[in-house]
Amino acid sequence: MEIQTVDFNVWPKGEFNADYAQLFTGNSYLADVGGGVHNVTFEPGCRNNWHIHHKAVQVLICVSGRGWYQEWGKEAVELKPGVVIAIPAEVKHWHGAAKDSWLEHLSYHKDVQDGASNEWQEAVSDEEYNKLK
């Protein structure tokens, strides 16, 4: 079987993420693609605040562009197409686009327990973000 790659993204960009705008630096877009999965699109330089998913694992699947994922107290991990990150419950983290690239990742939660919630915290500082290359 021959595998072909394509140079376009099949996932919809979605609508401006107005409900969560105050929890992001920059603009993001959200598309519900079904089955509890969302495509999140970040403009260059956009990232979400530090946050914790209580009683749920979050899975990120990078589908286009380039960006970053970072857990509190650890080095940032580069996101690029094909990278999958499984974020354990109770881990403080953030994710977003690189300064010079859009980023799209699929996001869903698994192993969701009763009482699951998100705790949004402080913004990722410009100083911290600007260290990433």
Report the location of each language-model feature.
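A short, N-terminal "cap"/entry segment at the start of jelly-roll beta-barrel domains
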Residues: M1-G35, S117-K133
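Conserved short histidine dyad/triad with adjacent acidic residue
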Residues: H38-H53
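Ligand-binding loop in jelly-roll beta-barrel domains
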Residues: W68, A76, K80-P81, A89-A116
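Conserved hydrophobic/aromatic beta-strand scaffold that supports enzyme active sites
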Residues: L30-D32, V37-T41, V59, A76, ...
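Short acidic/glycine-enriched loop/turn segments that link adjacent beta-strands
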Residues: T25-N27, A56, S101-W102
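A short beta-strand-loop-beta hairpin characteristic of the jelly-roll/cupin
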Residues: R47, H54-P81, V91
